[in-house]
Amino acid sequence: MKRTFQPSNIRRNRTHGFRARMSSKSGRNIISHRRSKLRSVLCV
């Protein structure tokens, strides 16, 4: 049986990357909340 996680950096960045986050209102909310918590990594 095939596993559910098949790693791919392109797909990872397109779905969870910074530009993907900034492209929607809710994604910008995620970035701002992570900035307010002073996260060292904002997104992938």
Swiss-Prot record:
- Alphabetic keyword roster: Ribonucleoprotein, Ribosomal protein
Q: Does the keyword tRNA-binding apply?
A: no
Biological process (GO) annotations?
translation
- List the residue ranges forming a coiled coil, or say none: none
Any GO MF annotation of the entry:
structural constituent of ribosome
TM helices/strands, residue ranges: none
Task: Please provide, in alphabetical order, the Gene Ontology terms of the cellular component aspect for this entry.
Answer: ribonucleoprotein complex; ribosome
The UniProt similarity line reads:
Belongs to the bacterial ribosomal protein bL34 family.
NCBIfam families in the cross-refs: rpmH_bact (TIGR01030)
Name of the protein in question: Large ribosomal subunit protein bL34
